[in-house]
Amino acid sequence: MKNDSMKSQYRINEQIRAKEVRIVGDDVEPKVYPIFQALKLAEEKELDLVEISPNAQPPVCRIIDYSKFLYQLKKRQKEQKAKQVKVNVKEIRFGPQTDDHDYNFKLKHAKGFLEDGDKVKAYVFFKGRSILFKEQGEVLLLRFANDLEDYAKVDQLPVLEGKRMTIQLSPKKKESATKKPATPKPATPAAVKAEKPAGDNEE
């Protein structure tokens, strides 16, 4: 089914309706040809006349092996799909009055997620009257983002969505996140002058 849909994207040979076409590619003089002459050229080479730009004036065609062309096109699409990295979003939930132990535990998990290349969506859930502490929740999320500044960049600042206040973070590039500050080298004097004791001076 997929090959059929790909085939329908291009007109070939007698399916081409234009009276003249511009041929491009190798082993042929690139110029405008009457359709009958273009078809004859393709037939002589035992190849296909493929319309690759139907909206051009006149339409642009290539003389190629159509089956091979479709195979290369499918292969290229498959390679592009493989290059697309799927990004996971990990959620971390806080309460408006999260204690330090719980906070540090979740902060450690967030660092791990970001180092693995995942995005982090952290939120404070307000239950019942705890919505009165929404400012406290915002402070908590901003602290969370600040503590992760070496690992993440902020995609979305804290925003209230119903009973949730959410912040979204995405990982920084690994070289930025893992870069360690340069350790200063111990100072080594270029030349150390030995001092003689005062009593050893020659008179």
UniProtKB/Swiss-Prot annotation:
GO CC, any one term: cytosol
Oligomer status and interactors: Monomer.
Family annotation (Gene3D superfamilies): Translation initiation factor 3 (IF-3), C-terminal domain (3.30.110.10), Translation initiation factor 3 (IF-3), N-terminal domain (3.10.20.80)
Compositional bias segments (type: Basic and acidic residues): 193-203
PANTHER family named among the record's database cross-references: TRANSLATION INITIATION FACTOR IF-3 (PTHR10938), TRANSLATION INITIATION FACTOR IF-3, MITOCHONDRIAL (PTHR10938:SF0)
Subcellular locations according to the entry: Cytoplasm
Broad class of where this protein is predominantly found: cytoplasm
Organism: Bacteroides fragilis (strain ATCC 25285 / DSM 2151 / CCUG 4856 / JCM 11019 / LMG 10263 / NCTC 9343 / Onslow / VPI 2553 / EN-2)
Entry's Gene Ontology BP terms: ribosome disassembly
Family that this chain belongs to: Belongs to the IF-3 family.
Name of the protein in its database record: Translation initiation factor IF-3
Function per UniProt: IF-3 binds to the 30S ribosomal subunit and shifts the equilibrium between 70S ribosomes and their 50S and 30S subunits in favor of the free subunits, thus enhancing the availability of 30S subunits on which protein synthesis initiation begins.
Keyword set, alphabetical order: Cytoplasm, Initiation factor, Protein biosynthesis
Residue numbers spanned by region Disordered: 168-203
Molecular-function annotations in GO: ribosome binding; translation initiation factor activity
